[in-house]
Design a protein with these regions (language model features):
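Extracellular mucin-like PTS domains
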Residues: 312-327
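Short, surface-exposed polybasic-aromatic patches that bind anionic ligands, especially phosphate groups
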Residues: 1-310
Length: 327
């Protein structure tokens, strides 16, 4: 079930790990320890919304470009050049930059379905850019980054496919909509392990404790959690977390879920996610989905029955194809 397309580009093939359901997977043997380390009593936090926070949109913004009608960035200087893709990068001069120290820039070239992502990005004179790191992803491919390489995220994963986007929630809530976003979300933890597991490619920690999650660890909201009492936007996010879960993608505040800013978000609605504590989550073992350690492709597994909880009947394989319309 791929993301709602952006400019006609699906965010990775339908059988990519980001687009795989995990409601039928076994619980990870270290699940209880992982959850305790992140915070059993700590609530979820949507790190996205409408309006501004400290003068910047709330969330990680993205934009599109057309390489056939533009020129690549003339020079781009990376702090971590040895783990960054050389380019060329098609980054519009006015590309939105995430507020705060991460300063992510995400751009989809809709001509080639290529995703460009920068970390700690800053435009310079003459169209040049500087950045901490940069990663280029072919959205039509399941290829992962080289083992051990970072990306614009500490886990070496793409950011954009893990963001909650308002257009997807709107499609989920429309008549005949799915009731959920058909892909995993990205989230952060304050303390991660000095390790990464598939599909992650990089770690950013000195902590060797097996009780804290490695980069790439995947969590899901327990199927027994009643989402029916929640407001619409929060309910879609929670149903998504039951079916597709979320991936540890970076170090940051505990249980912070990534999303793109949009004036359509209802911040009061999303705020209700804070009442969902970590104790309602479990880590899953998704190693059985792996086809090749260097690929994000998944083998098809049929999950067990899942409660509908007022969002419509949901029966599918792990790689169900779903179509969502962009507003």
């Amino acid at each position: 079930a791929p993301d709602a397309p952006i400019g006609g580009c699906a965010l990775f093939p339908a059988d990519n790990i980001w687009n795989a359901r995990v409601d039928g997977l076994p619980v990870h043997s270290n699940s209880a320890a992982y959850v305790a380390s992140i915070g059993s009593s700590t609530g979820l936090h949507p790190d996205f919304g409408a309006g501004l926070w400290n003068g910047h949109p709330i969330g990680i913004p993205y934009t599109t470009t057309r390489s056939s009608q533009s020129t690549p960035v003339p020079t781009i200087t990376f702090t971590y050049a040895d783990e960054s893709d050389a380019g060329p990068y098609y980054i519009p001069a006015d590309a939105p930059i995430e507020g705060g120290s991460d300063a992510h820039v995400l751009v989809v070239d809709t001509d080639t379905c290529t995703l460009y992502e920068l970390f700690a990005a800053s435009p310079g004179p003459g169209g040049a850019w500087t950045a901490g790191s940069g990663a280029i992803f072919d959205l039509r491919s399941n290829a992962l980054r080289p083992a051990g390489w970072t990306s614009a995220d500490a886990a070496g994963l793409p950011i954009l496919p893990g963001l909650a986007r308002y257009d997807e929630v709107q499609a989920a809530l429309a008549p005949g909509g799915l009731g959920y976003i058909p892909h995993a979300l990205r989230f952060t933890v304050q303390t991660s392990q000095r390790a990464y597991i598939w599909p992650a490619r990089h770690y950013a920690s000195s902590n060797t404790s097996a009780s804290v999650p490695p980069m790439g660890a995947r969590f899901r909201l327990k199927s027994s959690f009643d989402i029916s009492r929640f407001t619409p936007q929060a309910r879609v996010i929670l149903r998504t977390l039951q079916l597709y879960g979320m991936i540890v993608a970076d170090n940051g505040a505990d249980w912070f879920i990534g999303g793109a800013p949009d004036p359509g978000w209802d911040n009061d609605d999303l705020h209700n996610l804070g009442s969902v504590s970590g104790a309602n989550f479990e880590a899953v073992d998704e190693s059985g989905l792996m086809v090749d350690p260097n690929s994000g492709q998944t083998r098809s597994l049929t999950p067990g029955p899942s409660p509908t909880q007022g969002v419509g009947s949901v029966t599918a394989t792990a790689t169900r194809t779903a179509t969502a319309t962009r507003s």
